[in-house]
């Protein structure tokens, strides 16, 4: 890596033989130069008389094999202008520059460029930004879905590792601070890794124009092509296939009203703890999890295949009879009166309930209420009946949809990805295909719940602006889109079916149940529950075979074999292992010990949190005692950073760690500071647990 020199850059660019490919965006033909480039910065965060101040002290840029670095923004701006002049780039002729976690670099440099367009997934979360110079910055982090170290580890054509520990971020550095060869190598490799990663993406997609923006976009592209097109060219070579699928989509439409109901009905995975076990140190705890839970229900269950139709007769008797009908599903509002949990676990999410009267809440879940209103599916209703008692229920805004298996191209896409994930693991020479299929099978569900009406976030006059989308307009665009291959209600039922499957385990395991998280359960007395596990596994396999029969698919597709000949059936409970000790303090808060300590605590680094707890305790028991509702970890031991966005120009005299003082100017920045972590329970949850301990909550009854 060399220090940036304009003439050396020009000499290198002149030596390149670059082709151009074209892509249409909003009907306009855009030229892209087939060249790989990446950019990264190193920054310092400090405080001056209590004022947070952050700035860039080193940047690294790579284009193919040319890697250079600089120490101030003026050098980088000159480099960008040199690229523009050499390639004659503009909004219609572009060069893509990948940045790993673009949102971070963007905050430091957004005032330095004139922006043609900024596409962001959220406020301050840009993933594609086009300058008037024709330089298009893209985020490689949201494409890979992995941090830089894991991105490097997963490379299959290149052998390169992220340097770790070679750059001490606690030291104050400025553009005048000397950097050692080791420190510069750290900076160089961060850019080289991204270049290697994008080269592998180009090898896969053949051109930079075909690389999706996001990891979810990758699987979306793959499944869409299988649904709408034939052959690898993805041209409409089979007109009947394209038109048949388009006809299906034209019959699967929403209105603004049904879309809003879908939004209310949608819930994610179920994560919670048995309140009877919270705070206890439990021994010999077992863990089971579903193999590919969401893909399994996408294959085994039936989904809405008609436009939602409102029905009038909504008495309880009529509705419960409707729920028993085959090949129909429902979404609706339900008002429950005098509803109380009859289990040590609670299903209804407080955030999904409205008009609550005298609710008692168990860590975000409804334990009891005099009355409440919620929007649910018929699948949710059956779970509620199994785990709550209620005096009455009133239904309203009920919509009925005919159900059938998902279209065959979606089914075969999922099966193909699962087969590759299973059969290619550990096969020499197939690492890239294995990693791709593994990432895509995990993203299949995500594409099914992508929101139709999203806020638009962009930069206007260097200010972030959020624009509300017009629901009617977006729904109309959705209904008439010729590229659409999904139906939003499908995703709603994916999670509903997955929750039902999880709750089959919670209910069957009963008092031995401890904790669940989306697709896994922790519990006691494994031997006592083996019959349930075996029965469930036979049941889900039977359902998957029914789907195979329907589409004339081989049974081997739902249970492919590894390269060692071991069958890996889809959707079954898989035994994860036994923990010597386990303790939970609520959702996303648990600790277990097998031969080492492990923690999952929302907001706390797993590795650094474990290291700190170990450093404070002399025994395993001490570690579990330390993990309590008053646990506090100092800033130096959490691995957490507080991000402070600074949009104002600042300049200060800064003295670096070597004693060198210089005037530093910063147009905008992100200040990072270590922050402490304190584990605490909400007052409402503490009160609920106290009521249970004191006997006010017992056997499905709340005593005043």
Where are these regions (language model features)?
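N-terminal accessory regions of nucleic-acid-interacting proteins
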Residues: 1-37, 41
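Short acidic, Gly/Ser-rich segments with clustered Asp/Glu that frequently serve as metal-coordination loops
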Residues: 41-49, 290-296, 520
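Conserved DEDDh/DEDDy metal-dependent 3′-5′ exonuclease domain
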Residues: 63-173, 185-189, 193
């Amino acid at each position: 890596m060399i220090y940036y020199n304009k003439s050396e850059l020009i000499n290198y660019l002149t030596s390149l033989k670059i082709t151009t490919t074209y892509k249409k965006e909003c009907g306009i033909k855009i030229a892209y130069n087939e060249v790989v480039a990446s950019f990264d910065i190193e920054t310092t965060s400090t405080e001056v008389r209590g004022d947070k101040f952050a700035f860039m002290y080193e940047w690294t840029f790579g284009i193919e094999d040319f890697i250079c670095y600089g120490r101030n923004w003026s050098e980088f701006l000159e480099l960008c202008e040199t690229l523009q002049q050499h390639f004659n780039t503009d909004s219609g002729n572009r060069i893509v520059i990948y940045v790993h976690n673009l949102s971070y670099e963007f905050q430091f440099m957004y005032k330095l460029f004139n922006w043609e367009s900024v596409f962001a997934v959220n406020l301050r979360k840009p993933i594609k930004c086009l300058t008037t110079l024709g330089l298009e910055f893209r985020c490689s982090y949201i494409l890979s879905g992995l941090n830089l170290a894991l991105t490097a580890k997963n490379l299959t054509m290149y052998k390169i590792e992220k340097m770790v520990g070679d750059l001490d971020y606690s030291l104050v550095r400025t553009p005048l601070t000397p950097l050692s060869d080791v420190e510069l190598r750290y900076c160089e490799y961060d850019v080289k890794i991204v270049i290697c990663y994008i080269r592998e993406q180009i090898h896969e997609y053949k051109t930079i124009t075909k690389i999706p923006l996001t990891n979810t976009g990758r699987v979306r592209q793959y499944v869409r092509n299988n649904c709408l097109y034939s052959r690898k060219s993805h041209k409409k070579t089979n007109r009947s296939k394209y038109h048949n699928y388009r006809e299906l989509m034209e019959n699967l439409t929403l209105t603004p009203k049904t879309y809003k109901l879908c939004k209310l009905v949608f819930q994610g995975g179920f994560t919670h703890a048995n309140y009877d076990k919270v705070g206890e140190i439990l021994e010999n705890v077992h863990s089971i999890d579903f193999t590919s839970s969401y893909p399994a229900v996408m294959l085994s269950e039936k989904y809405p295949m008609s436009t939602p139709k409102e029905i009038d007769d909504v008495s309880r008797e009529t509705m419960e009879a409707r729920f028993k009908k085959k090949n129909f599903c429902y979404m609706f509002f339900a008002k429950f009166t005098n509803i109380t949990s009859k289990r040590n676990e609670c299903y209804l999410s407080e955030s999904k309930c409205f008009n609550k009267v005298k609710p008692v809440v168990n860590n975000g879940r409804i334990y009891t209420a005099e009355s409440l209103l919620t929007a649910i599916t018929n699948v949710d209703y059956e779970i509620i009946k199994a785990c709550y008692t209620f005096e009455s229920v009133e239904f309203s805004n009920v919509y009925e949809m005919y159900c059938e298996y998902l279209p065959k191209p979606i089914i075969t896409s999922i099966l193909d990805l699962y087969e590759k994930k299973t059969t290619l693991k550990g096969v020499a020479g197939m690492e890239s295909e294995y990693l791709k299929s593994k990432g895509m099978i995990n993203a299949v569900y995500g594409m099914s719940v992508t929101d139709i009406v999203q806020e638009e976030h962009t930069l206007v006059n260097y200010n972030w602006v959020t624009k509300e989308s017009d629901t009617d307009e977006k729904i109309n665009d959705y209904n008439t889109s010729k590229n659409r291959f999904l139906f939003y209600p499908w995703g709603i039922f994916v999670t509903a079916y997955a929750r039902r499957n999880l709750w089959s385990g919670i209910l069957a395991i009963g008092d031995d149940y401890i904790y669940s998280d989306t697709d896994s359960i922790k519990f006691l007395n494994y031997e006592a529950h083996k019959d349930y596990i075996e029965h469930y596994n036979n049941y889900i396999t039977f359902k998957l075979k029914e789907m195979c029969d329907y589409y004339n698919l081989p049974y081997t597709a739902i249970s492919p074999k590894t390269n060692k000949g071991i069958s890996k059936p889809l959707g079954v409970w898989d035994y994860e292992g036994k923990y010597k000790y386990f303790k939970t303090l609520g959702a996303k808060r648990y600790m277990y010990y097998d031969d080492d300590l492990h923690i999952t605590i929302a907001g706390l680094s797993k590795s650094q949190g474990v290291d700190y707890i170990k450093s404070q305790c002399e025994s395993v028991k001490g570690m579990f005692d330390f993990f309590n509702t008053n646990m506090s970890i100092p800033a130096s031991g959490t691995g957490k950073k507080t991000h402070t966005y600074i949009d104002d120009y600042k300049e200060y005299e800064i003295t670096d760690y070597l004693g060198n003082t210089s005037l530093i100017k910063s147009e905008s920045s992100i200040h990072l500071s270590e922050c402490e972590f304190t584990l605490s329970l909400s007052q409402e949850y503490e009160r609920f647990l106290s009521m249970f301990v004191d006997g006010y909550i017992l056997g499905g009854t709340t005593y005043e």
